[in-house]
Amino acid sequence: MHFTSSLLATLIWFTLPVQSLNTESRTTSNNTISILTNHFQILKDLLPYSKTSKPQIKESRPLIKVSRDGVPINFHRAPAIIMKSNKTDDLVRNSNKTMVLTEIKTITEFATTTVSPTQEFQALQINLNTLSIETSTPTFQSHDFPPITIEDTPKTLEPEESSDALQRDAFDQIKKLEKLVLDLRLEMKEQQKSFNDQLVDIYTARSIVPIYTTHIVTSAIPSYVPKEEVMVSHDSAPIVSRPRTDIPVSQRIDTISKHKMNGKNILNNNPPPNSVLIVPQFQFHERMATKTEVAYMKPKIVWTNFPTTTATSMFDNFILKNLVDETDSEIDSGETELSDDYYYYYSYEDDGKEDDSDEITAQILLSNSELGTKTPNFEDPFEQINIEDNKVISVNTPKTKKPTTTVFGTSTSALSTFESTIFEIPKFFYGSRRKQPSSFKNKNSTIKFDVFDWIFESGTTNEKVHGLVLVSSGVLLGTCLLFIL
């Protein structure tokens, strides 16, 4: 019996704190559940519903929409504001949701709520009565243990604010927000107006600056940039702008479209606070007429009056083709005029030397005069020959050479007869020949002369023709005689 009484006392001892803990855990769990349900309800209100009553996450709406002017649009369309209260499970299941829906028609008019204040007050009274707990514990007496008294103080929660007070607070907050939005709009309008005035002042200041036409500018152009003093008060007073420029207003609008803005004035001067200056630049450039280039033509080189390098090519290409007819006409008229300034100089060397040294060498000197100009008559290269002491000296020698002596012997008479000939030796004939003839090459110092040279260098054209006929007939007769014999 004693053992059973002690066992019952211990069981009661352990069960009482467990019961108290269960009550506390229930209250805390109820609070967390209510908070979670509130959050879920907010999400359900935000997400749109389709016909099947399922939320479409991809079509979620924003909480607050903002217009281009920076003003919130749907701030008065906020989701449900659920009343917070510590409720039991039964009250959470059966209680109705209280929502505050407000719509702003004007600044002072507000919509009424859907829940009456009397219903809300009754719900709060029920919550307070159910949450108050009063318990009394029995006393146990035993022989071994002293009596244990357990007294549990009643737990009462402080009553929350009524729905009327919360509703007033919500309306007050909404009024404050509306007032702030209106003040913000007024400030934005004033600021925009001040910025427009400032831009007009900048354009007019640019139009007054004189335009310099010189390439060198020594003085800096004064820039008239308005400076504004912005005074903002805490009572949302309008912005006061005081431009310091003395430019008349009538000149501002007319000169905006005529002149462009200079970028240096924007960069060098400090802009006013909370301003963004976006000015189009480089819009009034004059287009220059495109210059079409002349088509490139290859330069034409004039080859007339351009001397060649070799004398033989000059005579072959120019003199023989162009001057044969002129010399014929000059010989007929009795006048001999040369068309260039080329002179021939002859020298006679000893017979005992080499064969090449015995030839008559013609040295040609190219003068600075142009081709085609008339020069004095041809001078005979043998006009000054000193036959004394059997010496022949060339008078005009371009290079310093020692005079050469030749022993003529019986050739003096031949020289005299050669000098007394009526024909003259034209210089172009020798110039056209590739190889100089060896006319005076003989061991006996006799003068050799070509028949064809004698024919072409003497007389007129008729005499030349007759000479050729005679020579050709003689050659034919000689050949016939050789065949006969």
Curated annotation (Swiss-Prot):
Compartments, as annotated in UniProt: Cell membrane
Superkingdom field: Eukaryota
Keywords from the named record: Cell membrane, Glycoprotein, GPI-anchor, Lipoprotein, Membrane, Signal
Propeptide: 468-485
Topological relation to the membrane, as annotated: Lipid-anchor; GPI-anchor
Glycosylation sites: N30, N86, N96, N444
Predominant subcellular localization, coarse grouping: membrane
GO cellular component terms attached to this protein's record: plasma membrane; side of membrane
Protein name: Predicted GPI-anchored protein 27
